[in-house]
């Protein structure tokens, strides 16, 4: 009997918590039949706390990532690539529900997100590469553009035991009326090439996300968030082909796969 009472008490304690945890899932979607796809538009009920979390997650996960080992291309060489970015979100949480509008009440944003990217990189010197990327959701109102610079401090090809580099990047969110978002990234990466073709690597660093609200429906202060991250991956370079797989661990975990051509 005592065990039964303990189980009952535990169940009574858990049920409200479960109900609270699922409360966000019952949040109604904000609907505008004029949009073709889920688009960024702030609802009047968006709070400062939810906006802060959105800035951290959206800004960091969309930031320009290396998706390459810290191995420089070399002067005069260049690379073009197509990349797939995958990550998951809590799409019914306030920070995502109150920042998006939907074509109808059944058209969820979805927890699993995927975006293709176009990238290019050029070797300015043997130790300095400059790169850029671009993507957008063609049926929605957001996309991103980014620039980066990679400087090699140590190069395994020149006798060092590993390749060591520093990287800086800038990412701008495009086409959104309700906010201006810019993200700066600073990283240090190290990798070691095996068998002259495969380079496992790791990066550590942080994103600085600056999100300025510009909506007519809310009055929120600008958020400046420092979001640390680590990432690991491996790059296979053979002939004129580069294949990369990378995992980025931060407020949101993301996965990148890239295939490119080297010239």
Task: Name each region found by the language model.
Residues 126-130, 156-159, 197-200, 238-244:
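Repeated loop/turn-to-beta-strand initiation elements of outer-membrane beta-barrel proteins
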Residues 22-158:
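Transmembrane beta-barrel domains of Gram-negative outer membranes and organellar outer membranes
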Residues 92-97, 133, 142-147, 175-181, ...:
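Outer-membrane beta-barrel translocator domains and adjoining extracellular loop/strand segments
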Residues 159-214:
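Detector for outer-membrane/organellar transmembrane beta-barrel domains
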């Amino acid at each position: 009997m005592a065990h039964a009472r303990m189980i009952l008490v535990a169940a009574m304690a858990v049920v409200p918590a479960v109900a609270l945890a699922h409360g966000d899932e019952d949040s109604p979607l904000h609907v505008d039949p004029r949009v073709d796809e889920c688009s960024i538009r702030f609802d009047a009920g968006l709070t400062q706390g939810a906006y802060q979390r959105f800035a951290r997650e959206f800004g960091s996960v969309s930031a320009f990532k290396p998706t390459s080992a810290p191995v420089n291309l070399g002067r005069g060489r260049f690379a073009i690539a197509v990349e797939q970015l995958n990550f998951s979100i809590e799409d019914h949480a306030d920070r995502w529900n109150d920042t998006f509008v939907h074509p109808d009440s059944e058209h969820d944003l979805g927890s699993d997100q995927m975006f293709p990217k176009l990238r290019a990189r050029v070797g300015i010197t043997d130790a300095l590469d400059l790169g850029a990327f671009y993507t957008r959701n063609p049926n929605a109102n957001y996309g991103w553009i980014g620039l980066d610079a990679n400087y090699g401090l140590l190069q395994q090809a020149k006798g060092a035991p590993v390749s060591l580099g520093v990287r800086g990047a800038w990412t701008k969110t495009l086409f959104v009326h309700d906010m201006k978002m810019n993200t700066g990234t600073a990283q240090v990466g190290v990798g070691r090439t095996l068998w002259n073709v495969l380079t496992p690597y790791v990066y550590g660093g942080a994103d600085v996300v600056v999100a300025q609200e510009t909506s007519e429906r809310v009055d929120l202060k600008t958020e400046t968030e420092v979001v640390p991250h680590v990432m690991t991956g491996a790059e296979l370079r053979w002939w004129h082909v580069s294949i990369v797989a990378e995992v980025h661990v931060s407020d949101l975990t993301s996965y990148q796969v890239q295939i490119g051509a080297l010239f």
